[in-house]
């Protein structure tokens, strides 16, 4: 597939077939030793895509109230894809992060603030120097409340950009969450295991105005 083709989402009919077996990952989070799969009572899940998932995962695991994070693939068609398959542009997935958080400590709105303020949501099928559909900006809400908050935050951030003199349209995809597939274990908490590894995310200098 050419670089040009990788800038256009594959159709479900043309996506790779994938496999039934999930990627094996460590049982515990490498940073905080919490479960990588379980969701404790009272906690909630959020999914965000904002470029290379190595830096994105670190961004969120550092937030108070976040119980665990995981790198993976979302928004596509191919079941249990490999990293190489996702990078081919033939699965439809974005590199995404699964966040398990305690809403009594950190609100979904605060996660949205971290999302908007730490990447460029105007770049379409790329993020910085990373090109391809897997690097697109996306929010995958799980509930009507998350969906409403995501759309409202996009409107506020677009207005804040305009007020700052930036009139580029936001290209962030907001779509109901489809299955999330864990990435290979080598990608989990990558920047903890490789402190000098690549991190290509960065904001545009605009802050998300608070919700009403």
Curated annotation (Swiss-Prot):
The keyword Transmembrane does not apply. It comes from Salmonella heidelberg (strain SL476). Belongs to the MsrA Met sulfoxide reductase family. One of its GO terms (cellular component) is cytoplasm. Signal peptide: none annotated. Pfam families: PMSR (PF01625). This is Peptide methionine sulfoxide reductase MsrA. Keywords: Oxidoreductase. It is an enzyme of class 1 (oxidoreductase). The active site is at residue 52.
